[in-house]
Amino acid sequence: MGEPKAGNLIIETRDVSKLYGSLKAVDRVSLRVRRGEIYGFLGLNGAGKTTTIRMLLGMIRPASGEVFVCGQSILPGRGGPWERVGYMVETPRAWPELTVEENLRAASALRRLKGDGAARRMIALLRLDEYTKVRARDLSQGNKQRLGLAKALIHHPDLLILDEPVNGLDPAGIVEIRELLRKSAVEDGATVFISSHNLGEVSRMAKRIGIIHRGALIREVDAEELEASLHRSLVLDVRDREGAASFLAREGYAVDRDAAGRLLLSAPEVCGKPEEINAILVRAGFPPGYVAVASEDLESWFLRTIGEDAC
């Protein structure tokens, strides 16, 4: 995976850190996100995701390092390329007493867009037609999410920053939003930066995923390569883990542990064929049915990556 060209970068942070007293909320994070890319920013609650976003948006000043958005240096109190940026917080804000239609007209006016065309387009795009006269306070959580996304998209931004964008949506709604974001990236050339703790959804939407843990960006992966790698690993749940690990290591297999302490085996010649591993262990004296073998799942991979135990 090649490095993005400097002129093609929409988000760039250079060794950015943020301190709250003695707590290092963000620790030397360097991000490079391309034009037209969907980038997933993944971490547990408190990992540093929201603090990073607030620095991207110029809401807070880094303790050290530099932030660039759309090629422009970002610092609080200075102007920024905000006419090119759309942002949706985890709990979208709206004027509660205004209807959906009035909220979108107001958002359009704040962006200095002429007429009602942008508001009508967003109502159709986010399937809010039935709710145009409903006050924002009376919407379901899912429709509040739709309204928040509509407000973020209303001015055709070059960069869309989303914090937990599918919270409160049903499965059908999640699929709709996923396809909408892909369309924004592929057809409109928008860059989409998704912050979330939900690896499953992020891996379905993003091209690349950055893992932040305890303030540090500890890994970046290609989502398709991650999915393929899971199918190249087998998880063995055996009673005698130490005995099985020792035997398989003697047989030349690289044996690791997943987040739950189960054996993790990367064996391209047998992956996808768990029955062969069962047969090998049975021949070695492990009783039949003694071993359960499956591909590693996303949750196990994530917890193993950040070094946390499964609970």
Where are these regions (language model features)?
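ABC transporter nucleotide-binding domains
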Residues: 8-11, 18-194, 199-213, 217-219
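ABC-family P-loop ATPase nucleotide-binding domain
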Residues: 1-17, 308-311
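Generic structural signal for individual residues within well-ordered alpha-helical segments
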Residues: 104-105, 120-123, 175, 227, ...
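ABC transporter nucleotide-binding domain
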Residues: 178-268
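Short, charged/small-residue-rich alpha-helical element at the C-terminal edge
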Residues: 232-305, 311
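Short, flexible cytosolic linker that couples an ABC transmembrane/permease module to its adjacent nucleotide-binding
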Residues: 2-3, 121, 222-226
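Structural motif detector for alpha-helix initiation sites
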Residues: 35, 100, 223, 295-298
